[in-house]
């Protein structure tokens, strides 16, 4: 089974061809990613209109490269998959419309992939992992703990009630004057900092649910930074180290609860899996080893290039859905919001927050 995957939900334009073999294993035949960092850097964050226009300019060329590198012709494709959401709607429209055109012209089945499902299934692209497993999804737009029970079968066990983890890293970087994209810059600065200098809060620690909150921690960093004038490089490193240490401790606690909830409902997970751009953070990757060991399960984290947004994960999710007999109509709409767990409810008291979607 050969599938072309297209990713345009945020600020990466990507296309890939993945082969799903009869035994369920995979081969990545091509995986082309073009980051839009240069386009958005002057603004300190992603500008949706600029992102959408860049996708329009870049996508056709990237698809051509992905097809050429894979050695596969359009008529050989078993399916074409595109991220149909959630994401910045302009970019989602570009990718999904392009996939529909390819499907229509070549008579190829279309799969409209939930971007979060693609992250959830990526470990099966790299590790031959069987269901069920526990997913920690941490990116610029989402922070969730999810029970992955099968293709199309997901139960959300915990979510952020305010900032996503990647968003918090980026905002801390911006308030400290670090370059965009901020997450890797915070990680880099934290490596040489003193994590004990500032006593930052550990949000949601000890709660019986598995939800996250990072807004208060972000504010605490801002308040400490405001007390220091001038803000020297050493101060920035210490602030980043303290912030990251607080995130690590809170994450370990939240995941501990999430894994317990998983086991109570579904039995012991086959693995703890981390995905999303934040999973590329080396300190977080190291911290999760201890979390998995405490829960007596293994830890699986895809290579960093497959944690961040890419076309291979979309192609693989499309292949998984095709193998399960799932295809989509050419009338399938793009979605800015799209729950991975369609039955997920916002935590009590947080119905009007991002936890509701």
From Swiss-Prot:
Signal peptide: none annotated. Its cofactor is Fe(2+). Its EC number is 2.3.1.234. Fe cation binds at residues 115, 119, 309. Keywords: Acyltransferase, Cytoplasm, Iron, Metal-binding, Transferase, tRNA processing. GO terms for cellular component: cytoplasm. GO terms for molecular function: iron ion binding; N(6)-L-threonylcarbamoyladenine synthase activity. It catalyses: L-threonylcarbamoyladenylate + adenosine(37) in tRNA = N(6)-L-threonylcarbamoyladenosine(37) in tRNA + AMP + H(+). Belongs to the KAE1 / TsaD family. This is tRNA N6-adenosine threonylcarbamoyltransferase. It comes from Nitrobacter winogradskyi (strain ATCC 25391 / DSM 10237 / CIP 104748 / NCIMB 11846 / Nb-255).
